[in-house]
Amino acid sequence: QWPSSAASDVYKRQKLNFDVRKIFAPEHGFRGTEPNGANINDEIDIKTGLKIVSLHGKDRKYGEIDDYDLNEIDILIFDIQDVGVRFYTHISTLHYVMEASARNNIPLIVMDRPNPNAHYVDGPVLDLENQSFVGMHEVPIVYGLTIGEYATMINNEGWLDNNMKSNLTIIELKNYNRKVTYDLPILPSPNLPNRKSINLYPSLCLFEGTNVSAGRGTEMQFQIYGSPFLNKEKNNFRFIPKKNSGSKYPKHENLLCFGKNLSENKKLDKFDLSFLLNAYSDTNDKQNFFNNYFDKLAGTNSLKNQILSGLSERKIIQSWKKKLD
C-alpha cells in the first residue's frame, strides 16, 4: 500500500518524529491543485508549519533546487504520482532533484508508485535538439517505466550533468504487475480527473501544440477535443471552454468548439495518432493548426513535417517504431 498523497505522508512522518525540514513542490504544487504552467510562490504550509519551496516559480529554472535550500538537509525523499508520459513534467523535476542530490552528496530516496500507462511503449523518441522541461531525455512519449525505474535509468544512462551519479535508493513496489490496471489513490493534477483522461493524455496532449482544445476549461479534460475551426458535420460534439480552477486561460475560452467525445470508449487506453490526423484533416485553418510548442511536445520536428506532407498514419508510426525495437 502506498500513501494516498505526499501531503498525508509528510504528516505521518512528523508524527513518527522524523525531522522533516522543508517540502519541495513541483508543477501543480504540494497538493497537486495548481493549474498547469502556473508560477507558484514559496509559502509556509499551515498544517505542518513547514516551508514549501516551489520548484515551479517565476524566479527559478523550473524543477531546479538551489544548493542553499539543501544546507540543513541530510536526505531527500521524492514521492510524486507520475503518469508515465514524457511531457508530464514530474520526470524532468526528478532529473533536477537527482542532480541536486549528486551535486551536494545528499542521498535520495525515491518512493516508487504504479505507472497507469506502464502497459505499453509508443510514440516518437525525443531528439535532443527539442530538449526542454516537457522533454529532457531520449525516450518515447510513452516509456513504460515506473518513477523508480525511470530514476534508475537516469543514473545508469549518465544523463545527469557532468555524468554525475545520485546516491539513489528506490523503495520498490511489492507484487506490482504493469499489466494490471490500478486506480490511483490521488489525482496526478487538476486536469487529469480520472483513469480515462490519464490513458488519453499521451494522445490528446499533442493538441496543446495546435489550435485544437483538449478540453481544458471543461469537466472533461483530456477526454474530448475540438475547436471552432473543425468541420462541424464531421465533428458533432459541442463544448464551450470556460475559465475554472484547473485552467485560468483555456484555449478558445467562451467559444463554441466542434470535436469528438472520447470519454465513453473503453478501448482507448494506448497512444493513438488518429485523433491528431483527423483533426488536421477536418480543420478549416490548416495554416495556423500547429504552433511553436508542437515540436517540443512531439520531441521531434519530423512528426509535424510528416503530417504536413500527407504521410499516412501507418508510415508515420513505422518511422518511430524502428527506434523502439
Regions found by a protein language model. Give the residues of each.
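Single conserved hydrophobic/aromatic residue that forms the stacking wall/gate
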Residues: Q1-A7, Y11
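Active-site loops and adjacent core secondary-structure elements that bind or stabilize anionic groups
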Residues: V10, E208-T218, Y225-L230
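Short internal beta-strands
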Residues: D19-E27, M111
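Glycine-rich, charge-decorated loop segments at or immediately adjacent to ligand/cofactor-binding or catalytic sites
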Residues: G32-N36, I109-Q131
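Glycine-rich oxoanion-binding loops at beta->alpha junctions
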Residues: N41-E72
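Glycine/threonine-rich flexible loop motifs
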Residues: D82-L94
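Conserved anion/nucleotide-ligand pocket segment
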Residues: Q131-S203
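Conserved functional hotspot residues or short segments at active or partner-binding sites
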Residues: Q221, Y225-K321
